[in-house]
């Protein structure tokens, strides 16, 4: 079904082949994004200062919090589009694209305005040190003002993933990453704009990537062209998108909220400790990218096969994803002995290097369990059940992780707080396994029947 045009039908053929083929461009794109993040950290850490490096780290969960609602809608759109595409109903795919873009046009600007208004209260709640406060404020104000481009890019990517196309999203991301790096170097090294330059480079690059993606999709796939101002809105279909997307968005918001609460505790130990966490978390995030790409691939794979009512293929795809993810999580343990060397690339401050290396030693073993939880939750989301992920986040990330982080940090010292993050993942993994084995996530069936 339109596979020659880059739209991949995953309801036939090898499950492993489809998942790996779909995941590879996502992985390449994620490496590009992380490469940019590391260049960003290198530029900020070496040419602006550790205070600015801490400020950028503080900003990450805040930005994720603001964008997560529309990212959830995008995920809901991906699942709905994938199921209709797998069921062979292009006219319903068309309806879903129009509906989700109408929601974006009506809601993105108000969200950006709200985000700008909430920057100062959130920084106060995060207890950001005076040394990093001004730079964190500038960074967040600029990025929040430009959230429209970030949300639009994610929406384009979500539509294409639902259609089985992950290669084109790599092109969009390549445009954004290359432009971002060039502008970073220009604004920071040449214009000397500091953190403002880093933030401005980000929003310009993402806005251009969004508009480029819009033009590309409309020319390459006229049957599924994006019409931002058509204002075609299918209310029943939007309810279905929100049934899947709203819990997904709230789940991501809870992840961001939990990260912000943890970040508040991290900030209380000084900007060297915050900078170390920022660099260490970038390193483990990069190592996690293959698992993240497989989990993203399984959403579209499960969605298409649920739409086609092929449960046996769904189960096979989930098994392939789980085994591959656990194997890679084991490989990730190599970051522990390499920690000091890798942290030293971003900062020459001994306290930052030491604290960053300890972070990797504490957190990396828990990724074995986190990979299982992440893949199972994504697979069940592809089947139309995203409510469980939200409930799991409330239980494991808010009710377990946050209290454990504070308890361990206060009782045993700052380094032990990272075990609180790991304990949250242990609980989340156990809940995901039990729920997946229960089979309750299959209850929604194929959207094509509705």
How would you describe each model-predicted region?
Residues 12, 16-35, 39, 62-69, ...:
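Residue-level signal for short hydrophobic patches within transmembrane helices
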Residues 21-40, 142, 153, 176, ...:
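Transmembrane helical elements of multi-pass membrane transporters/channels
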Residues 53-113, 150-169, 263, 277-338, ...:
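Small-residue-rich hydrophobic transmembrane alpha-helices
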Residues 26, 30, 42, 79, ...:
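Transmembrane alpha-helix boundary and packing residues in multipass membrane permease domains
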Residues 74, 142-161, 169-177, 198-213, ...:
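Short runs within selected transmembrane alpha-helices of multi-pass transporters and secretion channels
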């Amino acid at each position: 079904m339109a596979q020659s045009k880059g739209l991949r039908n995953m309801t036939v053929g090898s499950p492993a082949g489809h998942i790996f083929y779909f995941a590879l461009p996502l992985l390449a794109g994620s490496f590009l994004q992380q490469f940019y993040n590391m260049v960003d950290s290198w530029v900020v850490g070496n040419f602006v200062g550790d205070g600015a490096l801490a400020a950028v780290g503080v900003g990450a969960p805040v930005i994720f919090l603001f964008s997560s609602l529309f990212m959830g809608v995008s995920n809901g759109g991906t699942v709905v589009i994938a199921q209709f595409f797998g069921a062979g109903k292009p006219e319903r795919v068309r309806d879903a694209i129009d509906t989700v873009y109408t929601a974006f046009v009506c809601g993105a600007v108000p969200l950006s305005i709200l985000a700008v208004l909430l920057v100062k209260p959130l920084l106060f709640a995060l207890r950001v040190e005076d040394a990093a406060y001004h730079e964190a404020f500038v960074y967040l104000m600029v990025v929040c003002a430009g959230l429209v481009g970030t949300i639009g890019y994610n929406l384009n990517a979500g539509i294409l993933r639902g259609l089985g196309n992950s290669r084109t999203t790599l092109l969009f991301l390549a445009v954004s990453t290359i432009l971002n790096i060039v502008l970073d170097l220009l604004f920071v090294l040449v214009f000397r704009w500091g953190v403002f330059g880093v933030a401005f480079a980000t929003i310009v690059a993402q806005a251009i990537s969004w508009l480029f993606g819009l033009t590309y999709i409309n020319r390459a796939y006229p049957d599924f062209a994006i019409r931002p101002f058509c204002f075609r809105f299918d209310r029943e279909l939007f309810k279905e998108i929100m049934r899947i997307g709203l819990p997904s968005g709230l789940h991501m918001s809870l992840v961001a909220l939990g990260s912000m609460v943890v970040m508040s505790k991290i900030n209380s130990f000084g900007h060297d400790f915050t900078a170390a966490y920022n660099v260490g978390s970038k390193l483990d995030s990069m190592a996690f990218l293959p698992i993240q790409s497989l989990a993203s691939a399984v959403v579209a794979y499960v969605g298409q096969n649920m739409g086609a009512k092929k449960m046996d293929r769904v189960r096979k795809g989930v098994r392939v994803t789980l085994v591959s993810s656990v194997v890679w999580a084991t490989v990730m343990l190599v970051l522990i002995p390499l920690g000091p060397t890798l942290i030293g690339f971003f900062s020459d401050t001994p306290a930052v290097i030491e604290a960053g290396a300890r972070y990797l030693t504490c957190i990396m073993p828990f990724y074995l369990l986190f990979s299982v939880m992440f893949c199972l939750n994504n697979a069940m989301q592809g089947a139309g059940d995203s409510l469980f992920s939200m409930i799991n986040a409330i239980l494991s990330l808010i009710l377990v992780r946050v209290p454990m982080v504070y308890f361990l940090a206060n009782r045993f010292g700052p380094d032990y707080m990272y075990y609180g993050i790991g304990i949250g993942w242990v609980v989340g993994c156990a809940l995901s396994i039990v729920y997946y084995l229960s089979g309750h996530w299959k209850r929604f069936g194929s959207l094509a029947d509705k």
